């Protein structure tokens, strides 16, 4: 008889050919047990490039990590995300940024990949998403008219177009026309009226300026407070932030918000948004991030913390934002008519907007 010795864990088994079947069973059982032992695998993660400020984004990412178990690694930039994505393909899975012009420019450069998520499609209205799924808005802000409560009657205000009327001569302040928020507004005028009409409007707006374009949106509120001008153009959420600051509350309290174009297309909206990069290594995790940021919890946090408008319907505005436009007919609890034109179309006119800014020498 064929006979050998085989040792497993100090137990010596003497077996013959008849016992070979038993040995096969033991090996099978051993392999099965090994498969039950947890394997050491890298933790899920997502690498993020953000042009949103760290203090604002940090609580959202903490909530994301706690809810999903995905680690969020972030690099913060003030600007230059297009160049960074070109220089370091594959280093970033998701981009978080502000302004439709930024999102459109990077999409046109081929640095995003399409995402087809039923969660995002449900949470975010179609006008706030790229038609090809290349990016999605996460919050919105209105580009509104700031006005002096003491020197301007509501009956004087109506539309963006009317800001070029002679009655506003030497009464308007703006920041640089080349700032992304103004470029987006001018792009929306081109989308609505065409290049020639938008240029005429921009020339009329320039003619009505009380001073050379300067400062930021908060600076326009301060200028109204100081009497340098009566009317300005700015984003809604800045007013919310100013009302929370002791050193700026008095400025903001003297200025009202008017939502233009309520009787036609609605107020121009801009956004913060997100996208999955073309070379994302952790694509699934990047999609999970955008889904989370478009969901109820993150949308509520955006609204309450930064006084932005949630893009998901049914999420409450902050108390401050709900008070905006309270004196304006047709505006109730801060709810107003928004321009529903797809933002990708508006963003596509950004180069023409810059061209007519050059042609009218807006900042000079």
Description of each model-found segment:
Residues 272-337:
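Mature extracytoplasmic/periplasmic domains
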Residues 90-95, 113-145, 161, 171-174:
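A structural signal for short loop-to-beta-strand junctions that line the ligand-binding cleft
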Residues 44-104:
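Early extracytoplasmic/lumenal segment of secretory-pathway proteins
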Residues 122, 127, 141, 202-206, ...:
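Periplasmic-binding protein-like
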Residues 332-364:
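Conserved C-terminal helix/tail region of periplasmic/extracytoplasmic solute-binding proteins
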Residues 49-52, 131-132, 147-149, 155, ...:
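Short beta-strand->loop
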Residues 188, 193-260:
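Ligand-binding pocket segment of bilobal, Venus flytrap-like solute-binding proteins
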């Amino acid at each position: 008889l064929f006979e050998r010795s085989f040792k497993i864990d100090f137990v010596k088994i003497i077996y013959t050919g008849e016992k070979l079947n038993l040995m096969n069973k033991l090996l099978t059982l051993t392999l099965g047990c090994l498969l039950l032992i947890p394997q050491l695998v890298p933790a899920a993660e997502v690498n993020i490039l953000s042009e949103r400020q760290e203090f604002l984004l940090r609580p959202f990412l903490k909530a994301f990590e706690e809810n999903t178990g995905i680690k969020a690694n972030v690099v913060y930039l003030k600007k230059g995300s297009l160049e960074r994505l070109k220089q370091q393909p594959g280093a970033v899975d998701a981009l978080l940024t502000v302004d439709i012009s930024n999102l459109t420019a990077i999409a046109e450069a081929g640095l995003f990949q399409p995402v087809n998520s039923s969660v995002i499609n449900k949470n975010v209205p179609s006008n706030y998403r790229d038609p090809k799924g290349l990016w999605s808005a996460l919050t919105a802000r209105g580009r509104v008219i700031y006005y002096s409560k003491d020197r301007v009657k509501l009956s004087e205000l109506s539309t963006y177009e009317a800001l070029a009327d002679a009655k506003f001569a030497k009464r308007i302040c703006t920041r640089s026309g080349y700032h992304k928020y103004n470029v987006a507004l001018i792009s929306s005028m081109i989308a609505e009226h065409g290049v020639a009409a938008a240029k005429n409007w921009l020339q009329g707006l320039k003619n009505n300026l009380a001073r050379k374009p300067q400062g930021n949106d908060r600076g326009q509120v301060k200028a109204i407070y100081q009497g340098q001008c009566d009317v300005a153009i700015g984003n809604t959420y800045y007013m919310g932030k100013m009302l929370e600051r002791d050193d700026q509350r008095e400025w903001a309290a003297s200025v009202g918000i008017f939502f233009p174009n309520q009787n036609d297309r609605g107020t121009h909206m801009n956004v913060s948004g997100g996208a999955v990069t073309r070379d994302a290594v952790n694509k699934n995790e990047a999609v999970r991030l955008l889904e989370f940021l478009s969901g109820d919890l993150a949308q509520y946090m955006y609204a309450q913390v930064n006084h932005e408008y949630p893009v998901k319907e049914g999420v409450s505005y902050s108390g401050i934002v709900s008070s905006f436009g309270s004196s304006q007919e047709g505006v109730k609890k801060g709810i107003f008519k928004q321009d529903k034109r797809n933002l990708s179309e508006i963003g596509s006119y950004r180069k023409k907007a810059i061209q007519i800014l050059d042609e009218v020498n807006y900042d000079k």
